[in-house]
């Protein structure tokens, strides 16, 4: 994570991904792998049949993490050696926008995915989120959909690691309204997809 501007500094206490599917049925592949017919092929998303059951997933942030601006090295909000494992899936991002707010209550009803972050964000000495003594809960639309190298839209796939880089500069409240307080910077999320490698 980084802040969106050099005048900003942030403090993150917790992060949750909300409204992801959390259970289903997995069919063990029986087809043989093309490259080695002594083994079954690797699992695919189509081997999963997901149930309509949704949950929150928390990344384990054990203490306050300070984040700095874009020119700095990114700060990890999660432990690379303790990745968060979730089921392969496509999700629908929380549909709130700066001009058409949608509440968190509606997002939960419609199973729309978002990040719930407890944090402070300071811009040039002024608190945009939180205060000296308290964290504020901020929400960001989030989805599991990305573009693959062939420009196909897909969700999370088995056998890959998905790394998200968040540039904090804004966020939404629980009613879906943009929290700005004087800043014109927004928050963006970049995705990197890597083949899974055992550490």
Where does each model-flagged region fall?
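Extracytoplasmic cysteine-anchoring/structural motifs
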Residues: 1-199
